[in-house]
Amino acid sequence: MSDMRELLRANDPVLLSAVGALLDGAGIPHLLLDQNMSVMEGSLGIIARRVLVHDDDMRAARRVLEDAGLAHELRPDTEVTEDAALGGRIRLRQPRKGHRFGHDAILLAAATQAGAGEQVVDLGAGVGAAGIALAARLADVRVTLAEIDSRLVELAEENIRLNELEGRVNAVQVDAGASAWALSAVGLEAGTAAGVMMNPPFNDPTVHRASPDAARARAHVARADTLATWIGAAHRLLAPGGALTVIWRADGLQDLLGDLEPDFGAARILPILPRPRAPAIRVIVGAIKDSGTPPTTLPSLVLNDADNRPSAAAEAILREGATLPLAAPA
């Protein structure tokens, strides 16, 4: 039972029976144990009993009970934290360990352009931080959160509900490198998106040692073909003239521009500096599908002032929901 965790604890036989029936109905295997015992015999309602489910089934089991109005009976999910972003405008549930969202996701959302009623795909969405931040800023935009990791997809779905974005935002499980047929199977039809936003894995495996956490390693470490694969997927998804917005490490800018050609043009490059006069650590690039216009560079965003305090510009974006120049059409 090393791969099982406690879903809830109770000594009410009616509640325990109802929970068992709900889990059985959902096809979720579970065990019922006395709190301090390794037996499945009852304890006459004196000692609380534990309902255990496998790690892989925990998110689904919690959702079943939440949908049944039993969220208050659930044990706290110690594997997940709930954190505020955009100064509390959105809240996001994410793994306590492993891949967690950061400033990059919020900066990406602040740089993404979209019009009323348009569809934007957040490719490699994780728990949905960037796409949900975009949807919170633009009330008429529809967003699809596309993510390969099933656990992160489940958390993204929770975050959609947590931020009351059902109907405008949805989450699908799919690999960014999937075929056009596989993308279509989850509702991502070729040539239909007005925008694609993405924060691909970008750490160089020859420089950065991969995390022992598999999900974190997949989210952070790039393969040799990662960038080209993701850009190819974006090109397939975008409608003619659609906009791609990508955040990447600054020392890889030339690789990024090379992979954008010849399918994207009108690239606008926005360097992100950690402090004044320091080398850029990130670039955000916006480009237009099938445009032949040459690239331009925009004024840099400086995250911290000379005293290492957050700059006013960064605070406006990260806490107040301000946008970057890339969010406006060229």
What feature does the model see in each segment?
Residues 279-330:
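SAM/dcSAM-binding transferase cores
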Residues 157-190:
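S-adenosyl-L-methionine
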Residues 117-126:
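Conserved class I S-adenosyl-L-methionine
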Residues 97, 223-280:
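Conserved Class I SAM-dependent methyltransferase catalytic core
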Residues 142-147:
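Conserved SAM-binding motif I beta-strand of class I
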Residues 200-229:
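Mobile active-site "lid"/loop adjacent to the S-adenosyl-L-methionine
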Residues 75-116:
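Class I SAM-dependent transferase core
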Residues 127-140:
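Conserved SAM-binding loop of SAM-dependent methyltransferases across substrates and taxa
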